[in-house]
């Protein structure tokens, strides 16, 4: 493995760990709102809440990103890029579009 590949893998692990730690913190602070914001089902949120720091580090060590870019819908992405009413309308529209997306579960 060359230096660029190992650097990329290290960056992926760092993003994964940051994401998992943030998700746990969000769920502890406001479980229901965080499930909505993260797009988690009850089962996934419960599992994530129970993971120990060692388990988080092990899970973060994956060579794949654990978080998913949810802006794969043109209408959602365009809603976020239009400045209407100082951004309030676009934020509401984006929230509605995100809420319509199905909750994905860890396989």
Curated annotation (Swiss-Prot):
GO biological process per UniProt: bacterial-type flagellum assembly; positive regulation of DNA-templated transcription; regulation of bacterial-type flagellum assembly
Provide the alphabetized UniProt keywords: Activator, Bacterial flagellum biogenesis, Cytoplasm, Disulfide bond, DNA-binding, Transcription, Transcription regulation
What Gene Ontology cellular component terms go with this record?
cytoplasm
Source domain of life? Bacteria
Q: Which Gene3D superfamilies match?
A: Flagellar transcriptional activator FlhD
Q: Where in the cell is it found?
A: Cytoplasm
Tell me, what is one Gene Ontology molecular-function annotation carried by this entry? DNA binding
Q: Which InterPro entries match?
A: Flagellar_FlhD, FlhD_sf
Q: How does it assemble?
A: Homodimer; disulfide-linked. Forms a heterohexamer composed of two FlhC and four FlhD subunits. Each FlhC binds a FlhD dimer, forming a heterotrimer, and a hexamer assembles by dimerization of two heterotrimers.
Q: Per the similarity annotation, which family is this?
A: Belongs to the FlhD family.
Summarize the protein's role. Functions in complex with FlhC as a master transcriptional regulator that regulates transcription of several flagellar and non-flagellar operons by binding to their promoter region. Activates expression of class 2 flagellar genes, including fliA, which is a flagellum-specific sigma factor that turns on the class 3 genes. Also regulates genes whose products function in a variety of physiological pathways.
Q: Domain annotation text? A: The C-terminal region contains a putative helix-turn-helix (HTH) motif, suggesting that this region may bind DNA.
Descriptive protein name: Flagellar transcriptional regulator FlhD
- Organism of origin is Bordetella petrii (strain ATCC BAA-461 / DSM 12804 / CCUG 43448)
